[in-house]
Swiss-Prot record:
Principal location listed in the UniProt entry: nucleus
DNA-binding region, residue range(s): 182-241
Protein name per its UniProtKB record: Homeobox protein DBX1
CDD domains referenced in this protein's UniProt entry, alphabetically: homeodomain (cd00086)
Record keywords, A-Z: Developmental protein, DNA-binding, Homeobox, Nucleus
Source organism superkingdom: Eukaryota
A cellular component term, taken from the record's GO annotations: nucleus
Region named Disordered: 55-103, 241-345
A GO biological process held by the record: ventral spinal cord interneuron specification
Gene name of this polypeptide: DBX1
Record's keyword annotation contains Nucleus: yes
Biased composition (Acidic residues): 330-345
Record localization: Nucleus
Phylogenetic lineage: Eukaryota, Metazoa, Chordata, Craniata, Vertebrata
Length: 345
């Protein structure tokens, strides 16, 4: 080495190059140091560091021993203050004190506390820079990560690649839960399928499961679609039959299922309810005759005129009156036949 004096510590100042002179200070001095108003990282770590962090191989020097009462407490205090907040001369690289660092000694660790807190590595930094280090910030410091996709997509499109947060905003899915199974899309049937379903419905209102499967396979539909179609068709058919039954004077209880008849055939109920319709159908072909005969006797004007005009005839014998009445009835029958022919034609 051309400059051995730079690496070897000067003999006159052994205590200035020894770091951590306050490690073995008593609690009274540490409490005195705790009242220091500086909030630098060096001061905080040095004061709060326990004695277990002593460097390996370091032997306390006479200057690091507890001071005598009434002796140079001020000197140790000044020495500690020099290490805690070194002056501007000690932080410059050109001074001989900063040229030799504690890390050069073999007993110190490369990343130990003494090497970190030494004055040599911090020649380029200042207390203002230490205090002005910005904290770790995200793209949106005022919003949580779960709200970032909404803001990122609409208002901040350029910040989507700054902080990728996978799997964000999952609480709407947890609130909704599983999707409902019953939500089926409405099926649209073709004309051929609708005609085949209607034809099967006319045969049997309640289709059996084997027939339902066969019909579904034949029409290319699902079993559930055929089942739902039959349910809807039965409800529509029952509503129409109930309206007919109620309009004809029946009661709704006849349409409800019972133990004896769990599946009531509303077509039979509709025929039983309006019984007059069946009677009218039976009386349809022969109904005009009794009505005409019943109304012909009092309603015929000729029949009303003959008794008035032939009022003196009742004095005549009964034999003479009988042929007249017979002729009157014969005339009325002829007229009725003529009327019947007219109505039929």
């Amino acid at each position: 080495m051309m400059f051995p004096g730079l690496l070897a510590p000067p003999a006159g100042y052994p205590s200035l190059l020894r770091p951590t002179p306050t490690l073995t200070l008593p609690q009274s001095l540490q409490s005195a140091f705790s009242g220091h108003s500086s909030f630098l990282v060096e001061d905080l770590i040095r004061i709060s560091r326990p004695p277990a962090y002593l460097p390996r191989g370091s032997v306390p020097t006479p200057s690091m021993s507890p001071p005598r009462p009434g002796a140079p407490a001020a000197l140790t205090d000044t020495g500690a203050s020099d290490l805690g907040s070194p002056g501007p001369g000690s932080r410059r690289g050109g001074s001989p004190q900063t040229a030799v660092s504690p890390a050069s000694e073999p007993t110190f660790l490369k990343f130990g506390v003494n090497a970190i807190l030494s004055s040599a590595p911090r020649t380029e930094t200042s207390p203002t820079l230490l205090q002005s280090v910005p904290p770790k910030t995200f793209a949106f410091p005022y919003f949580e990560g779960s709200f970032q996709p909404f803001i990122r997509s609409s208002y901040f499109p350029a910040s989507s690649s700054v902080v990728p947060i996978p799997g964000t905003f999952s609480w709407p899915l947890a609130a909704r839960g599983k999707p409902r199974r019953g939500m089926l899309r409405r099926a649209v049937f073709s004309d051929v399928q609708r005609k085949a379903l209607e034809k099967m419905f006319q045969k049997q209102k309640y289709i059996s499961k084997p027939d339902r499967k066969k019909l579904a396979a034949k029409l290319g539909l699902k079993d559930s679609q055929v089942k739902i179609w039959f349910q809807n068709r039965r409800m529509k058919w029952r509503n129409s039959k109930e309206r007919e039954l109620l309009s004809s004077g029946g009661c709704r209880e006849q349409t409800l299922p019972t133990k004896l008849n769990p599946h009531p055939d509303l077509s039979d109920v509709g025929q039983k309810g309006p019984g007059d319709d069946d009677d009218e159908e039976d009386e349809g072909p022969g109904s005009p005759r009794p009505r005409l005969v019943y109304h012909a006797a009092p309603a015929d004007p000729r029949h009303l005129r003959d008794p008035r005009l032939e009022a003196p005839l009742p004095t005549s014998p009964a034999r003479s009156g009988s042929p007249d009445k017979a002729s009157d009835f014969s005339d009325s029958e002829d007229d009725e036949e003529g009327e019947e022919e007219i109505t039929v034609s």
